[in-house]
Amino acid sequence: MIAVGSDISQKTIDVQILDENETYIKIQNNEIGFNKLLKKLSDNPCNYHFCMEATGNYYENFADFLVENGFQVTVANPLKISKFAETEFQKTKTDKQDCKLIAQYCQEKLLKKHGTYKKPTEQQYQVKRLLSYINQLKQQKTALMNRQKSCKDEFIEIELKKQLVELKAHIKTAESKLSELTKSEEKDRLKTIPAISETTARVLVHFLTMFDFKTANKFTAFAGLSPQQRKSGTSVNKKEKLSRYGNRILKTALYMPAVVAYRMGVFKKMTDRLEKKGKSGKVVIVAIMRKLAVLAFNLYTKGQVYDIRKFG
């Protein structure tokens, strides 16, 4: 099987095919470009395995087109590609170099053991975009509230209040639409986890449904909840920190439930143990976020409800 790496931007796609000639082609990120590539690949689609990074939503149409035409596709976590680049000592960063690196990653890692991409349903895409839209609205709301607190002009303060009312109405409408699309038994089961709200349960079910996570560790890595620590001899000993990678929407959705769970004293044995080790409040919150994600994965995959005797 031939590995193919794709570096995708809003308007173009750089494609590196690891065939005998190491063919490189740049195409438009639209159907015209996709068909141009299809003509270039004269062999049976089963002979190719495409790999691309899960960045934004620029990859979606291309990945769907490939699957519809019989190609195998993997949408990889950018963190894995980044780590692979480090092992290859790659320092040059160009679109052409990036797509070749992704192809090499596909060849060395994925062809041995890979998880292929399945085209999401139209409803899953709609939920994904609604979640992103709601997240953006909430960020705008926070920014407006901060401006309102520091505002010293009466006229501007009144205008900000009006904008805030409108924004809250937009959020309510979007969440109502999201609720229509995400009615499910899975969501109700996840709501049995302490501190998991309706909104958070929707987000969790969406990602657990849309991506085929084989293990809880893969789900937490996707969320960016794998702590990183740099420690080597006595020269490097930095504080443990949360990975800057991971899905921002999922990570954001788990943050407030973790704070609430901490205040409620949920998972007290775990938090007491971490605090005795001198871990900071931030590290404890991240540990709870990870615990919630693992619980969600287990309840979702096993079809169970939360039981404190079983899950702690």
Regions found by a protein language model. Give the residues of each.
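Gly/Thr-rich phosphate-binding beta-strand-loop-beta motif of the actin/hexokinase/Hsp70
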Residues: M1-L18, I102
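Long, charge-rich intrinsically disordered scaffolds of nucleic-acid metabolism proteins
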Residues: P78-R189, I193
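Nucleic-acid-processing active sites and adjacent nucleic-acid-binding tracks
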Residues: N21-H49
